[in-house]
Amino acid sequence: MAMDKVGVSISEMQRLLGIKQYRTAWLMAHKVRKAMADRDSRYRLAGLIEMDDSFFGPRGKKPGRGSERKRVVLCAVSLYRDREGKERAGFAYMRVVEDGSAESAGDFLERLGCGPTTGEGRQLLEAIRTDGWRSYGKVARDKDLKHCKVILRDPKAAGRLLPWVHRVISNAKAVIRGTHRGVSSKHLQSYLSEICYRFNRRFWEKEIFDRLVLACVSTQTITYKGLVGHETSELAS
């Protein structure tokens, strides 16, 4: 779960570790995902971020915003420039939200660090780069953020004009479809947290396992009873 870029399915984990009961492996994986989410919740994004939404759920006739039976997921990736001046991705964060409204986007940004300031009084989060969806413009004004709006005349150009955030989204959908063969909407957030945790530590391959063990022993545990409930399987699309 820590080092494989596409994660590991519960069945494969069960086989590798010699765990007899599927339920035991499933619970263990969710305990690890909670530790991942708790550790990443300590961090805040700063400077400029790329931000966009996507839809996770069963395939349907109606694509994009307004899709039925799909969960809205907001994704943000912080950006910085390397020594050669090339834009690079820093930290990624994904969250399941109620809808694509400015209110949902505002709550999302507050979780990322919008509001807290530096010693000089500047916001940690200064600017967002998004497509032209009206909710982003409104939340940028409400939060006093610079808004770098990218006009997408062709939806297929999103991956080129907002490359990092769409790379993270595409990776998440590939993992959910491929490795896990779909996940329930109830537990979608924990899988997204796992995917972001690995992405955020992609340069720490030698340390990531030990860091995850430390996160696991220092987080509040979760029980099987707290995890289960009525749910239906939904494939990412």
Where are these regions (language model features)?
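Residue-level recognition of single "structural anchor" positions
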Residues: 1-237
